[in-house]
């Protein structure tokens, strides 16, 4: 990614020179996207649709429904997630708030990723078992690996901005001492690595599964009902379309993984990722069953699965923006 996103010294110099607390496009997209996901998922928790069934089998979270009941645990999570989303968005005005929101998001996503190891049905027996994942909850939870990278990055970037930008800095143009933004910069670096390789892992895993008949059948409704890509089935067939996607996604994963040593590959890989998630997000508007029976904006499991792509699209845009020099 670019200096505007990843190098605090360069970014700070730009802020001091312009006299504005501006943000790189990538950071704005990441914060806005993650905030939207937490706000939406948090609101859904008050409808009785949520993660409580996943928590029951978790050694870390099973005490919540046991202590508060299913509805109480769902409402507790809803309040926590809504607060997280509000704090993330509040960071546009006051960075320290999104530093707190980012930390809360990272804590939440660490717990949800841990559910992959405790929830029955994560592995898909119809595709041969692990490492083949079921769509829900396996692939649904795997996406949180990428979202976790965003949360860590936002926490670090917000902490860095909150500590490094001051009226004195903007007036004098003198950069702050390293101590003032060192912690934030280190957390940002961890988050950046997590985003890049988390996204690469998702593409690699999802791409490999596209070669199975289970996955080809599973994604068929998304493709068949899409005005953008519905022609894939008539041209390539159900398995052929899935195989093509598998090749595309694995190639995307490889290009993202080699970003540090091949910047041009990063441009191509990030652009491929952006294209992928623009298409998958369009499925929210074309796929039957995206909303729950009570209707929009309450989403079904399929809808929530697709909504997470807002965050993954944010990573892709941030990587593309950064690989192009932050212009």
Regions found by a protein language model. Name each.
Residues 2-327:
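Membrane-interface extramembranous regions
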